[in-house]
Amino acid sequence: MPGGYGVMGDDGAMDYSVHEAWNEATNVYLVVILVSFGLFMYAKRNKRKIMRIFSLPPPAETLSEPNFYDTISKIRLRQQLEMYSISRKYDYQQPQSQADSVQLSLE
């Protein structure tokens, strides 16, 4: 290519493929910028609608949250009751073993 990188053709005429590609690229960029700007303006005006779409899962999550804490409190209550029953069993068994030990020490 004696004339350069695609600027001059074989017959000496200007090769406009670079200019056409540039024009198409700038048109695409312009369309992308305009669409982005339009979406930004739409999002700014309809912020509540968009936020309502993304905020649907949290109400279902808040319903499960009290159940989670209820189950934790029930588990804690059950543990406390088990510990109380174990301590009561130990208290009932303790005087007998003390009486036995006292009897053994007296003998």
Swiss-Prot record:
It comes from the Eukaryota. It holds the Pfam family UPF0697. It is a single-pass membrane protein. Its main location: membrane. It is found in: Membrane. Keywords: Membrane, Transmembrane, Transmembrane helix. Coiled coil: none annotated. GO terms for cellular component: membrane. The chain crosses the membrane at residues 20-42. Belongs to the SMIM19 family. This is Small integral membrane protein 19. It comes from Bos taurus.
